[in-house]
Regions:
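Extracytoplasmic loops and strand-loop junctions of Gram-negative outer membrane beta-barrel proteins
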Residues: 21-24, 61-63, 105-109, 157-163
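Gram-negative (and chloroplast) outer-membrane scaffold detector with strong preference
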Residues: 43-138, 177-180
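Predominantly the C-terminal beta-signal and adjacent terminal strand-loop region
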Residues: 131-182
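Sec/Tat signal peptide C-region and signal peptidase I cleavage site
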Residues: 15-19
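Positively charged n-region of N-terminal signal peptides that target proteins for export
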Residues: 1-4
Length: 182
């Protein structure tokens, strides 16, 4: 009986132990892009793989002497990352399917472009462990796909200069992110 109780007492703390399977992060560099709010959630699928879902949102329009400036967007992405050494630590490479609705104008010229983009992206980077629960992620990514757009003379006038559809290849992320691992 004493051995059984001792065994139970030794093994009981292991019942509450879980691996760090989830991550929640925000890209600090994206806030410099006219205040684009963002979040990414990841789940460990194994030692080397995790699935992720990300969202970016920017509803802001700023006023300058030349008129309104905006880089408004709503973006969704879903994908996976491969970690050669161990999940949430070291180098990684990833891919994602993405969709974006955007309205950008008044930044370099009064011309405004809005539309929808659909495509896929590749990214890579490095996760530096600050603590067992907090990472600093640095990375870069590109994405390409189809862009359906309209071009307007200015952000508020509504005079259409053109419409179209084209393929694109654009930088997607310049990442300096804080990730909470739990």
């Amino acid at each position: 009986m004493k051995r059984w109780l001792l065994s139970l007492w030794v093994m009981l703390p292991a019942v509450g132990c879980f691996a760090q399977a989830w991550s929640l992060s925000t890209n600090l560099a994206a806030y410099a892009d006219f205040g684009t709010m963002n979040a990414e959630v990841g789940y460990a699928l194994g030692r080397h793989w995790n699935a992720m879902a990300a969202v970016r949102y920017n509803p802001f329009t700023f006023t300058s002497d030349d008129g309104p400036m905006q880089n408004r967007q709503r973006s969704l992405a879903a994908g996976a990352r491969y970690w050669p050494w161990h999940i949430y630590s070291g180098w990684w490479v990833g891919g994602a399917a993405q969709a974006q609705e955007y309205n950008r104008g008044g930044i370099r010229s009064p011309e405004t472009r809005e539309g929808q983009r659909y495509g896929a992206g590749l990214s890579g980077g490095y996760a530096y462990m600050l603590t067992p629960w907090l990472n600093l992620d640095v990375g870069v990514g590109f994405w390409g796909g189809i862009d359906r757009y309209s071009v307007y003379e200015c952000p508020v006038c509504g005079l259409t200069l053109g419409k179209g559809q084209k393929t694109f290849l654009l930088p997607d992320r310049l990442m300096l992110a804080l990730s909470f691992i739990f």
